[in-house]
Amino acid sequence: MLETRKPAGELFRLGRKPDPWQPPDWSRANPDGTFGNRFDDPQGRYRVLYASSQRISCFVETLARFRPDLTLLAELAQIDGEDDFFPMGKVPRDWCDRRLLGVASADVEHADIYASGWIALLRTKLADECLRLGIADLDAGFLQVAPRRITQLASRQAYERSCPGIYYRSRYGHDFDNWAIFEPFPIIPVSSTAIASGDADLTEALKILRVELSGT
């Protein structure tokens, strides 16, 4: 039997106002039918909502794109002298104003596609596509950093087996448990709240990522 995981508690999601659990409109889809995200449907038939078990994970996942460029960090590391300067990425000041933090329950089993049974299945089902892309092998380590095409095809494999979504650990830290929830979204929204600039989890996420709100 293929491995599954169920959320141990409520799920959190950062989304745009007025409803953080509203999926993106199909009009915003890319020409390939996806929205460019990790577990989107490669056939463009179902949409996916991304949520986290940890409130702070929502901030880390969403704000990671504002981190300082890795090339810049490498160049700074080569400069002689006191290591007392670290360039901070800048988050637009209105970032908080345009979003809400939603809370929902999702008491259903999700595909744990990084578990051994799923890896064995995906290695077989996605073999042709892996070879076409020049990928020599597929294992859990590779799937963690695999091209979008591969993770999206893995999503389709889970969907075709009637899984309501996927459990996965964050690329930014395996202490963050994330969930890709397939349409028709088996969730029960509980609440949604505005994000204060002094929010404790937001502040900690900014610290982890070495970014800051513009104007602070």
Task: Tell me what each language-model feature is.
Residues 36-73:
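Extended catalytic/binding region for NAD+/ADP-ribose chemistry, centered on the ART fold
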Residues 1-38, 71-216:
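Active-site and NAD+-binding cores of ADP-ribose-processing enzymes
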